[in-house]
């Protein structure tokens, strides 16, 4: 394969893995540890 193709594939994989990790952090088990500022300041 050409260098540009390998570079594009590696950047794409990195972007997909980062997006997957962000979604897991936002909606998976670690989301229970996130604080919600709207719940802290109810009127």
From Swiss-Prot:
Nucleotide-binding found in the keyword field: no
Gene Ontology biological process terms in this record: photosynthesis
Pfam families: PsbN
Entry keywords, A to Z: Chloroplast, Membrane, Plastid, Thylakoid, Transmembrane, Transmembrane helix
GO cellular component terms given for this protein: chloroplast thylakoid membrane
InterPro entries: PSII_PsbN (IPR003398)
Keyword Plastid: yes
Membrane topology: Single-pass membrane protein
Transmembrane segments: 5-27
Subcellular location, principal: plastid
Location within or outside the cell: Plastid, Chloroplast thylakoid membrane
Family per similarity comment: Belongs to the PsbN family.
Function according to Swiss-Prot or TrEMBL: May play a role in photosystem I and II biogenesis.
The name this protein goes by in its record: Protein PsbN
Native species: Thuja plicata (Western red-cedar)
Gene that produces this protein: psbN
């Amino acid at each position: 394969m050409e260098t540009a193709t390998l570079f594009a594939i590696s950047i794409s994989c990195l972007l997909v893995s980062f997006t997957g990790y962000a979604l897991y952090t936002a909606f998976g088990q670690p989301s229970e540890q996130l604080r919600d500022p709207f719940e802290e300041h109810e009127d």
